[in-house]
Amino acid sequence: MAHSLGEQYDLGKPTEEHHESHPPAHQAPHAGGELGAGQKTSQLARSNSSSSSSSEDDGQGGRRKKPIKEKVKEKLPGGAGGKQTGECGTTTTTAAGGHEEKKGVMEKIKEKLPGQH
């Protein structure tokens, strides 16, 4: 007897052979223990992409996670070229006023050039 497509692939109700061959997800055993009623599990799909920045090859075929500092250095512009020390501006005190003013790099250079005072 031939089955029509509507009978064979009834989307409204699962067929008995489908129901018997695949147990429901909430009854499947889980590696972490049994699940209670109403709990669902989900797994994230993971790719083996070599462009991932969250892990590196450990040299023995396995993977290891990168330290947070290393990840941050990769994301910063200019790479991990070196450490920044000090500030761009300097605080100086004038003899007359006694107040502090910040000078930028350009102002310091202009002060050192002859004929600019």
From Swiss-Prot:
Give the matching Pfam families.
Answer: Dehydrin
Region (Disordered) location: 1-117
Induction per UniProt is: By desiccation (leaves) and by abscisic acid (ABA) (leaves and callus).
Give UniProt keywords alphabetically: Stress response
Task: Please indicate which superkingdom the organism of origin belongs to.
Answer: Eukaryota
According to the UniProt entry, which residue ranges have a biased composition of type Low complexity? Answer: 85-97
- Comp. bias intervals (Basic and acidic residues): 13-23, 98-117
Q: Indicate the secretion signal residues.
A: none
The record's Gene Ontology biological-process terms are: cellular response to desiccation; cellular response to salt; cold acclimation; response to abscisic acid; response to wounding
What's in the GO CC field? cytosol
Question: Which family does the record assign?
Answer: Belongs to the plant dehydrin family.
What is this protein's name?
Desiccation-related protein clone PCC27-04
Source organism: Craterostigma plantagineum
Classification of source organism: Eukaryota, Viridiplantae, Streptophyta, Embryophyta, Tracheophyta
